[in-house]
Regions:
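Active-site-proximal or metal-binding-adjacent scaffold patches in catalytic folds
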Residues: 1-154, 163-206
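Walker B catalytic acidic pair
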Residues: 159
């Protein structure tokens, strides 16, 4: 506990250094090696106190806004940024909808970018919006079905760019910008709404 902020401590032999994280649900987690003395952990928390309080307060405000917004979306879901009745959809339905869209757009965008991919999959609980393996297997988060189509296209372009550049180098971002000039705005919008989308999907049945 630090000034009424509860802290969850996780100790493990696999953890090599002290770290402090705040989850989207406002849980503060202190990760520490098994061998770390309590005095060192306390000193580390003291060092991070100013950052923790500032960040926690900022996230608390965002979380409050999120809860307020979710209340206005009770029994509602977004499908391609359009408000729909949540009772009319299951997660399986949304997966089919996103799959159909990706099946249509992926080949077209890949052809435009003069690249190719092995296949793609959709993950319900993905921690990232999209990914591209070394063998060009693409993966997309189901929550993208809530986003506007232009934002989904940005994620497609982002992952297809990884079939050409396997990192986030300047050449990678140049490639993304060629095919998605406003990618920065779309990326920021997704970043701001990803937790909201994930919470919307939680109310649906499989």
């Amino acid at each position: 506990m630090l000034d009424d902020i509860p802290i969850t401590i996780q100790k493990s032999k696999k953890i090599k250094t002290l770290s402090l994280n705040i989850t989207p649900s406002l849980e503060v987690i202190l990760k520490m090696p098994d061998s770390c003395p309590q005095a060192r952990a306390s000193a580390f928390l003291k060092e991070q106190e100013a950052w923790l309080k500032k960040t926690f307060l900022s996230m608390q405000e965002k979380y409050s806004l999120l809860r307020s917004r979710l209340e206005t979306y009770q029994n509602k879901i977004l499908v391609f940024d359009e408000v729909k009745n949540a009772n009319d959809y299951t997660l399986t339905d949304l997966k089919k909808i996103l799959k159909t869209y990706l099946e249509q757009k992926l080949p077209l965008i890949a052809q435009k970018m003069q690249t190719s991919y092995t296949h793609f999959s959709i993950r319900n609980n993905a921690k990232v919006l999209g990914s591209c393996s070394y063998h060009n297997r693409l993966s997309f988060a189901l929550l993208l079905v809530c986003a506007q189509k232009e934002a989904i296209d940005y994620v497609i372009i982002h992952e297809l760019a990884h079939t050409i550049h396997k990192n986030h180098s300047q050449n990678f971002w140049r490639c993304v910008q060629i095919f998605c000039p406003n990618y920065r705005a779309l990326r920021e919008r997704l970043k701001q709404r990803v937790v909201f989308y994930a919470q919307l999907l939680k109310q649906l049945q499989p």
